[in-house]
Amino acid sequence: MEKLTFLSLLLHFVVFIASTIPSSSFLLNDRTFERSNLPSTRAEKLIRELNLFPQQDLNVIDVADLPLTAAEGPGIVERKFVFPNILADGGPTVDDLGHHAGYYKLPKSRGASMFYFFFESRNKKDAPVVIWLTGGPGCSSELAVFYENGPFKITSNMSLAWNEYGWDQVSNLLYVDQPVGTGFSYTTDKSDIRHDETGVSNDLYDFLQAFFAEHPKLAKNDFYITGESYAGHYIPAFASRVHKGNKANEGVHINLKGFAIGNGLTDPALQYPAYPDYALEMGLITQKEHDRLEKIVPLCELSIKLCGTDGTTSCLASYLVCNSLFSGVMSHAGGVNYYDIRKKCVGSLCYDFSNMEKFLNLQSVRKSLGVGDIDFVSCSTSVYQAMLVDWMRNLEVGIPTLLEDGISLLVYAGEYDLICNWLGNSRWVNAMEWSGKTNFGAAKEVPFIVDGKEAGLLKTYEQLSFLKVRDAGHMVPMDQPKAALKMLKRWMENSLIEDATVTVAAQGGEELVAQM
C-alpha cells in the first residue's frame, strides 16, 4: 500500500518547485496553470515537451478500417514490399533484398495488432537477428528506419537513398512499432493499451514466437535486442522475458546473446541526480545554479524509493518531483536542444522529422505497406501517458541475472545528450551489483577506434561494456553512423577492441595497454 501521507508531501513539493524554479515557463506551453489540478495538468504539460511528443492520440480504429494486412486470427500476416523512388545512386536493386512489412495480432488483446518492418541482411542470411526498439514511450521505430540505422535515408525531395551504414549490412533487422498504439500499430479497443513493462515485454515475446515460426531458418541465428532512450526500460524487461521463456522451454528457443541500450533511461535513482552534474560539466549552468538543484536531489531519490518497482500514484509523484531537476537545468540552458546540446532546439521536436511523416502518409507508400488509412504519427502522447507510472521504476534490477547467465550487455551513450546523458548511464552501470562489479570498476577506459581514429571511450569486462561515443547526441546511429555500425558488428563478434592489443598514450606520458 502506498504511503499517501508522504505522497501529499511530494505533491506540495512540486507546487513549491513550480513557484520557485523559473523553468515552468519552459516545460509548460501555458505560463500559468491551476495548481488545484496540479498532478494531471503538470503531467500532461510535461508529456508534451519532454521527449519527442506531438499531441496526437493513439491508433484506435474502427473494425471497418482494418489494414489490408490485418490478421484474421492470432498470428502474422507479412508481405514483401517495394518503396517508390527508392534507388537514387546505384547500389543493390530491390530484387536483391528481402524487405518485409507486416502485422501481428496480439493473442492477449481484444483487437490489437503490432506493425513491424523486417529487412533481410544485405550480405549473409545467417547473420544475427537484431531487433530495434525506439523509446518515447510511444515513439515509432520508423524514426530509426529512416534517420538512424535502417537500410535507407529519406532525402529532402522525399525519395530514399541507400544507407551505407545501415545495420542490415551485418544483421537481419527487425523494427517494431510498440507499445500498442504507436506508429502503424493499432487496436480496436482502448483496453488493449499497455501500462507497464510486463504487458510490453509479453507482447514482444509473443511477437517473436510468431515471427520465428514464420521464419524458422532465422530461429537458429543469434539474437540481439537493441534500442535507445525509453527503450532503456523496454530492453531489460524484454531480455528477461526471452530468457525466462528459454529456461522454461516455452515455444521456439530464441538464441539470445546480448542486449544493447543507447542513451537509455534504466535506473532513474542514479540517472536523475546526474542532471546538475552533467549540466555543470558541460557549461549549461553555473556552480550556484548547480548547488540549488542539488538540494532537490534527496527528495527525488526518496520519491523514487517510494515508487519502487511496482508503485503507481507514487511513481507519478516521483516523476513530477524529479523532473524538476531537468526543468531547472533547462531554465538556464535556454533554447538548447536537450538531445544534442551543441545545437538549438528548433520546432516542437528539436529535430525535423516531418519528411518521414509525409512519406509514410503517401498513398503509394501506404499501398505498398498494406496499412490502410491509419494516420502515421512519429510519437503518441496517449501511449506516453498510459506508461507514465512506469517511468520512474528501476529496470536495472533484472540485468545482473542476465549477465551471470552469460548474456552480454552493451550500454553506449553519445557525449552531447542531456536528457539521457552518458554520466547518469555510467553511474548505474558502475554501481550495478553483479559478480564482475569490482573488476569492471577497476577496468581501464580505452579508445574505441574506427578507421584509426578515436570514436569513443570503452570500458569492458566479461559480459558488460560501456561506450561513451564522441561527437554524438541522443541518437548515436544518426550522428555517428559508421561508428555505430562498427560498434554493433564488433560487439556481436565479441571484439569491441579492434586489435588484440591496443597501445595508446595515457596522461603523463605513460602507456595504457588494453588486452581483449
Curated annotation (Swiss-Prot):
<feature type="signal peptide">
    <location>
        <begin position="1"/>
        <end position="22"/>
    </location>
</feature>
<feature type="binding site">
    <location>
        <position position="420"/>
    </location>
    <ligand>
        <name>substrate</name>
    </ligand>
</feature>
<keyword id="KW-1015">Disulfide bond</keyword>
<feature type="disulfide bond">
    <location>
        <begin position="139"/>
        <end position="379"/>
    </location>
</feature>
<dbReference type="GO" id="GO:0000325">
    <property type="term" value="C:plant-type vacuole"/>
</dbReference>
<keyword id="KW-0325">Glycoprotein</keyword>
<dbReference type="InterPro" id="IPR033124">
    <property type="entry name" value="Ser_caboxypep_his_AS"/>
</dbReference>
<dbReference type="GO" id="GO:0004185">
    <property type="term" value="F:serine-type carboxypeptidase activity"/>
</dbReference>
<keyword id="KW-0378">Hydrolase</keyword>
<comment type="function">
    <text>Probable carboxypeptidase.</text>
</comment>
<dbReference type="InterPro" id="IPR001563">
    <property type="entry name" value="Peptidase_S10"/>
</dbReference>
<keyword id="KW-0865">Zymogen</keyword>
<dbReference type="InterPro" id="IPR018202">
    <property type="entry name" value="Ser_caboxypep_ser_AS"/>
</dbReference>
<feature type="active site">
    <location>
        <position position="229"/>
    </location>
</feature>
<dbReference type="GO" id="GO:0006508">
    <property type="term" value="P:proteolysis"/>
</dbReference>
<feature type="active site">
    <location>
        <position position="417"/>
    </location>
</feature>
<dbReference type="GO" id="GO:0005576">
    <property type="term" value="C:extracellular region"/>
</dbReference>
<dbReference type="InterPro" id="IPR029058">
    <property type="entry name" value="AB_hydrolase_fold"/>
</dbReference>
<keyword id="KW-0964">Secreted</keyword>
<keyword id="KW-0732">Signal</keyword>
<dbReference type="GO" id="GO:0005773">
    <property type="term" value="C:vacuole"/>
</dbReference>
<feature type="glycosylation site" description="N-linked (GlcNAc...) asparagine">
    <location>
        <position position="157"/>
    </location>
</feature>
<feature type="propeptide">
    <location>
        <begin position="23"/>
        <end position="82"/>
    </location>
</feature>
<dbReference type="Pfam" id="PF00450">
    <property type="entry name" value="Peptidase_S10"/>
</dbReference>
<feature type="active site">
    <location>
        <position position="474"/>
    </location>
</feature>
<feature type="disulfide bond">
    <location>
        <begin position="307"/>
        <end position="322"/>
    </location>
</feature>
<comment type="similarity">
    <text>Belongs to the peptidase S10 family.</text>
</comment>
<feature type="disulfide bond">
    <location>
        <begin position="345"/>
        <end position="350"/>
    </location>
</feature>
<protein>
    <recommendedName>
        <fullName>Serine carboxypeptidase-like 49</fullName>
        <ecNumber>3.4.16.-</ecNumber>
    </recommendedName>
</protein>
<keyword id="KW-0121">Carboxypeptidase</keyword>
<keyword id="KW-0645">Protease</keyword>
